[in-house]
Amino acid sequence: MKQLYWNICGEGDCDLVLLHGWGLNAGVWHCIIDRLTPHFRLHLVDLPGYGRSTEFGAMSLSEMAEIVLQQAPQQAIWLGWSMGGLVASQIALSHPERVRGLITVSSSPCFTAHDEWPGIRPEVLAGFQQQLSEDFQRTVERFLALQTLGTESARQDARLLKAVVLQHQMPEVAVLTGGLDILRTADLREELADCSLPFLRIYGYLDGLVPRKVAALLNSQWPHTQSVVMPGSAHAPFVSHPEAFSQLVVDFAQQSNT
């Protein structure tokens, strides 16, 4: 049976699963691990087809969620960044009994722009898919650079993300294309409106992929959820502002436990 790569660490009583974004792997969390391990038992996974979980091919959002659940703790707080936020949200919808709380980071229930809904223009995602087949390493690097654009530490943060990707074998083009398909087609807005779990949404003020307008729109549509827009950060707030980010996660876990 194929197995995902998992790394479990930490001294806390509360299980926290961290799901990375498109093109990356669990190494992306290294700048917050030391801040979180005193409070949590961390479960760091390479999503199917990424990092050290290379035996898997492209798959749908629901398929990815089911595979991740197979080796996950029975109940945990789930934190998903970017595409990982969609996976965590899908798990909260399909298996709410496994979820103590949901945190999405620089994520959107619908990444693609529609009428009166801010997001990535469909032609931009289509362009990335086309470029993947021509020069996939350069395309991944361009996508990573977009994630840190505008922050004071943009170049340093982009180098860090690139180093995380290059730590391991690059994902197959089919896996990367499948991930972009998820970003292009997923729309969980209506389903998540009925989610009654403790739910925190974290955004970066300077994020060029998930506009901060999404936070305000969902505040009115999902009044049962909390949101924080982190000033000075872009698409990877845990990289640019690890201390403030980690504190948000710890505070949310404590609230969810009361």
Curated annotation (Swiss-Prot):
Keywords assigned by UniProt, alphabetized: Biotin biosynthesis, Cytoplasm, Hydrolase, Serine esterase
Keyword DNA-binding: no
GO biological process: biotin biosynthetic process
Taxonomy, superkingdom: Bacteria
Ligand binding (substrate): 22, 82-83, 143-147, 235
Reaction it catalyzes: 6-carboxyhexanoyl-[ACP] methyl ester + H2O = 6-carboxyhexanoyl-[ACP] + methanol + H(+)
Gene3D superfamilies: alpha/beta hydrolase
Residues in AB hydrolase-1 domain copies: 16-241
Keyword Hydrolase: yes
Subcellular location(s) of the protein: Cytoplasm
The protein's Enzyme Commission number: 3.1.1.85
GO MF annotation terms: pimelyl-[acyl-carrier protein] methyl ester esterase activity
GO CC terms, sorted: cytoplasm
Pathway linked to the protein: Cofactor biosynthesis; biotin biosynthesis
Active site (UniProt): 82, 207, 235
Family designation: Belongs to the AB hydrolase superfamily. Carboxylesterase BioH family.
Role played: The physiological role of BioH is to remove the methyl group introduced by BioC when the pimeloyl moiety is complete. It allows to synthesize pimeloyl-ACP via the fatty acid synthetic pathway through the hydrolysis of the ester bonds of pimeloyl-ACP esters.
Subunit structure, as described in the record: Monomer.
Family annotation (NCBIfam families): bioH (TIGR01738)
Stated name of the protein: Pimeloyl-[acyl-carrier protein] methyl ester esterase
Species, as recorded: Yersinia enterocolitica serotype O:8 / biotype 1B (strain NCTC 13174 / 8081)
